[in-house]
Amino acid sequence: MLQPSRRKFRKEQKGRNTGIATRGANVSFGDFGLKATERGRLTARQIEAARRAISRHVKRGGRIWIRIFPDKPISQKPAEVRMGNGKGNPEYYVAEIQPGKVLYEINGVPEELAREAFTLAAAKLPLRCTFVSRQIGA
């Protein structure tokens, strides 16, 4: 499971996820990518589930890059606890996703196989995604 090894502060404020992705919006490592078209949050478990779906579909071929990392802690209070008495403990980590962000990349496989693998991965994620390929000269 992906999570930061060390943090300066354990807890973080909620914040607002606005704007579109300017960094990480192009396919830069592989030949094909899975790009988010909506904004949202991806938990470490969702990122791992999609990664497994991709790697199982392409079997031994290809190389996969995960372009996102869950670095934002989400805190929760235990069940049946009254309001107040401070903020809950960090329970899991999420990656905040803006539209246009490339989530996964792959190379070393045919386009049809990559498209099928990313379709399986997109089904595991709570946001709409699209298949993209590398721009020549970019």
Curated annotation (Swiss-Prot):
Bias (Basic residues) occurs at 1-13
Start and end residues of each stretch annotated as Disordered: 1-22
Q: Which Pfam families is this protein grouped with? A: Ribosomal_L16 (PF00252)
Domain of life the protein comes from: Bacteria
Q: Does the keyword Transferase apply?
A: no
Biological process terms in GO annotation: translation
Q: Does the keyword tRNA-binding apply?
A: yes
Which residues are listed as membrane-spanning?
none
Q: One GO CC term of this entry? A: cytosolic large ribosomal subunit
Q: Which InterPro entries match?
A: Ribosomal_uL16 (IPR047873), Ribosomal_uL16_bact-type (IPR000114), Ribosomal_uL16_CS (IPR020798), Ribosomal_uL16_dom (IPR016180), Ribosomal_uL16_sf (IPR036920)
Keyword list (alphabetical) reads: Ribonucleoprotein, Ribosomal protein, RNA-binding, rRNA-binding, tRNA-binding
Q: Which GO terms describe its molecular function?
A: rRNA binding; structural constituent of ribosome; tRNA binding
Q: What family is this protein classified in? A: Belongs to the universal ribosomal protein uL16 family.
Briefly state the protein's biological role.
Answer: Binds 23S rRNA and is also seen to make contacts with the A and possibly P site tRNAs.
Describe its assembly. Answer: Part of the 50S ribosomal subunit.
Name this polypeptide is given: Large ribosomal subunit protein uL16
- The organism of origin for this protein: Methylibium petroleiphilum (strain ATCC BAA-1232 / LMG 22953 / PM1)
